[in-house]
């Protein structure tokens, strides 16, 4: 059976600061790169938004998906069950990024997705390319607004 592989990375220049993400989708000899930059955000938001963006870009949602991320925050939250606990308690205790986690959770209900951790800044060419995309997006002009973050950062 064919598997869709998604490599992701997020970056921020300062935490918070300008940030961006990079995504590579690969399936059956096809490859697509996606990136976007934001004027004020955090590295964790960009890591998670990269995963969400990759999943949202999938056309063949019936195929199994493996997402490779160098973010332990994202991989552990999903694979070790933290996210299910956060959802069950409505993010009590000040868990951050509720908007993105809720978006991921809703999206993941209709996709057979597994996350795998990869070491960042190492020898994985796809992760390294995602890092290039993310940092270039963060350094770009005309950065988008991470509206939820900017409205809620001081709460």
Q: What spans do the regions from the language model cover?
A:
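Short beta-strand scaffold segments in enzyme catalytic cores
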Residues: 20-27
């Amino acid at each position: 059976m064919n598997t869709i592989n998604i490599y992701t990375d997020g970056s921020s220049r300062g935490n918070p600061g300008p940030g961006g993400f990079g995504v590579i989708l690969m399936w059956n000899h096809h490859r697509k790169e996606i990136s976007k930059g934001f004027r004020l955000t955090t590295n964790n938001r960009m890591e998670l938004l990269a995963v969400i963006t990759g999943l949202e870009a999938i056309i063949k949602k019936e195929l199994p998906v493996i997402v490779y991320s160098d973010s332990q925050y994202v991989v552990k939250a999903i694979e070790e069950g933290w996210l299910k606990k956060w959802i069950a308690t409505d993010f009590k205790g000040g868990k951050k990024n509720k908007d993105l986690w809720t978006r991921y959770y809703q999206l993941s209900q209709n996709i057979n997705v597994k996350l795998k951790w990869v070491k960042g800044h190492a020898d994985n060419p796809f992760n390294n390319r995602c890092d290039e995309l993310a940092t270039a997006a963060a350094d770009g002009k005309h950065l988008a607004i991470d509206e939820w973050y900017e409205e809620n950062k001081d709460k």
